């Protein structure tokens, strides 16, 4: 079994400095001490389960650099860098590109004019790339990736602005298994998932709003935000070990466990061979 490797960024400059999704409100900002404590707990939980965590250097003025999942898409030693829809996040790209270039990855960019927000909207389940579009990423970017990688890509239209990235409402657990929140997808998208993923564990609406689907999967361990008891029960029935880590300070910005991490060696659910 390969050693799991995950990229994270300490929340030294994290805060609610702008509003680019329905979760964010500058009038209800984050508490730095609580954010640091919650991030540290997630970090320690992952390390305690055998993960090697690589760290980005935080940058002043880039509060969302902490959400490394949006840096880009990793495929073997290729890194497809994100083109963010919002300028306030586009300033993160040079730092992510520099990190990946310095750590042995070939950094690539999608064609100009195509918005693409990385592993936030592009998740492998088996050999298939499931791709969220409309709110942040463009469907054209996923078509491009499918051609370059030689992989089947299944576009999924996101229709609920509170679930603006695919990783907020869909979490592959293993090839053919995933958590999802049906209410984030249109009828066609729900049908696509039901057809192509053998086992789907639906998240209750209240737990979906706790970002229960925004989970980190390491083998049979699934790390979620707190307040997702029914989802945890379903995971245990499937043979997984759910672990709850309070991440409410990051929910204020529309993020949770998965948003705070980027797998560098391929998700356990991904089949790249």
Write out the residue ranges for each language-model feature:
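The feature marks the mature, well-folded catalytic cores of soluble enzymes
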Residues: 1-273
């Amino acid at each position: 079994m390969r050693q799991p490797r995950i990229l994270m960024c300490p929340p030294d400059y994290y805060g609610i400095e702008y509003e680019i999704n329905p979760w964010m409100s500058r009038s209800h900002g984050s508490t730095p001490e609580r954010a640091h404590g919650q991030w540290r707990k997630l970090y320690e939980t992952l390390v305690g389960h055998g993960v090697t965590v690589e760290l980005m250097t935080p940058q002043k003025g880039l509060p969302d650099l902490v959400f490394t999942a949006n840096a880009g898409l990793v495929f073997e030693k290729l890194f497809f860098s994100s083109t963010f829809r919002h300028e306030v996040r586009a300033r993160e790209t040079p730092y992510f590109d520099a990190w990946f270039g310095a750590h042995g990855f070939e950094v690539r960019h999608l064609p100009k004019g195509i918005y693409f927000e990385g592993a936030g909207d592009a998740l492998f389940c088996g050999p298939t790339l499931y791709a969220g579009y409309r709110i942040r990423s463009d469907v054209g970017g996923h078509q491009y990736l499918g051609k370059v990688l030689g992989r089947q890509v299944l576009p999924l239209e996101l229709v609920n602005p509170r679930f603006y990235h695919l990783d907020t409402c869909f979490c592959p657990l293993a090839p053919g298994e995933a958590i999802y929140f049906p209410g984030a997808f249109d009828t066609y998208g729900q049908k696509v998932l039901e057809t192509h993923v053998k086992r789907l564990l639906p998240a209750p609406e209240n737990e979906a709003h706790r970002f229960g689907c925004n989970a980190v999967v390491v083998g049979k361990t699934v790390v979620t935000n707190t307040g997702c008891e029914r989802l945890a029960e379903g995971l245990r029935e499937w043979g997984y070990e759910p672990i709850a880590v309070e991440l409410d300070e990051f929910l204020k910005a529309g993020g949770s466990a998965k948003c705070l991490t980027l797998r560098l060696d391929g998700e356990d659910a991904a089949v790249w061979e």
